[in-house]
Amino acid sequence: TDGGGINSFNPFTEKFAHYPSTWEDKVASICPFTPGKLLISLFSQGVFIFNPATGEKHPFTIVDNETNTRLCNRGKAVNLLQNTPHSILFLGDHVYKYNLKEQTFNIATEQEGQDIIGTLLPIGNYQDYTYINDTKHIYELDNRTNRLKALYSCRKDTVINSVSRDEEGHFWIGSNYGLIHYHPGTKTKTLIPTSLFGEITLLVCDQQGKVWIGADSMLFAWLIKEK
């Protein structure tokens, strides 16, 4: 949580457990690491290896001290995603791929002239590809070649707040202008008109024909087929 540190919930006992060692930590991202360990990204502190059994956390260095300081101590958070069973993505000013077996980092190859704008956020993994977004683009990372390319770019003053991919492979974008649908096959985008809300804070596709939307402190559902 944002200031409350790490908490766990056991769905069988329906009980929460709080880890006092993480109190006041602003947790930006969590992902699996090695057996019995998690990686946690803390805002303005860095990335740590966390042991849920003991509550202990130890600093984890991204590439080297210089890179780690640049990514973690300048008012931004590093987001984490396990994109394959053998690798973890550290999303910062670039995409840093960490090989769990070799314990090495590689930076994803970017398109020439393509600048990452704002914070990189994970959308998800689908077969050999991982999808990521910043405030202006949706990117596709080829997990085999470690190449990053932009699939979608928004124009002018449109800002991407949230992206989710549905069961058909289409992208739904929550922006400061509302809901946008992007079809990667035809490369067409459609702004969905509505008077119910303006800017979208967060959205997620349930993979069952609905897009769930958080906007204006309310929850909405867009029925994809029924429109």
Give the role of each language-model region.
Residues 1-227:
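Carboxylate-rich, polar loop motifs that coordinate divalent cations or form catalytic acidic clusters
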